[in-house]
Amino acid sequence: GDVYKRQGIANPIGLKCGPSTDSDDLLRLIEKLNPLNQAGRLTLIARMGYSEIHKKLKPLISAVKRSGLIVGWCSDPMHGNTVKASSGFKTRKMDDIMTEVRGFFEVHNEMNTIPGGVHFEMTGQNVTECVGGVYEVNESNLADRYHTHCDPRLNATQSLELAFLVADLLTENRNNVKKQIVAVS
């Protein structure tokens, strides 16, 4: 149903890939959603969870790379790392989010593919919805400023921490690409 409906859409499409995504199924979906193999048409959104990112993302990238299918790759380190705190609040741990982001970039560097984007849920407000970060929001702080009506968001400080991490990872990625170009020349 959903795949059939999306085949006729002219807009770019994002396809979520979790730890249970099978390589063969993914290739079939890519071919259905992007039958003309157009660049920019389809972005695969990896949401594996911090403990699965290396093990589960590599086979997917490898299969797509071998197939010659054109996709963009994006990391969503939020959804695969949602947990329930002992207080009952739904939360996410900064360390887990950052580990998944690092893993996403590491796998792409290893596979010589492009880490094309990241997706974060965040707010500029000083909320206490995700634990960790330099101000050490912990489970006992969650009730202080837990304002979300849906999923836990990074607060302003946590968002900046993540922005600096991504900047470092992008710089490292760019430097690796430069080294490869020099090695080939």
Write out the residue ranges for each language-model feature.
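Short, small-residue-biased leader/transition segments that mark boundaries at the very start
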Residues: 1-4
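Conserved internal helical-beta-strand scaffold that buttresses enzyme catalytic cores
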Residues: 6-14, 21, 162
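Short, surface-exposed connector motifs at secondary-structure boundaries
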Residues: 8-14, 36-43
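Conserved, mostly hydrophobic/aromatic
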Residues: 15, 76
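Active-site-adjacent beta->alpha loops and helix N-cap segments on the catalytic face
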Residues: 20-30, 52-56
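Short, solvent-exposed amphipathic alpha-helical segments in soluble enzyme
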Residues: 29-35, 59-63
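Non-transmembrane, aqueous-exposed alpha-helical and coiled segments at domain scale
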Residues: 41-73, 79-128
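Flexible, D/E/H-enriched segments
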Residues: 109-185
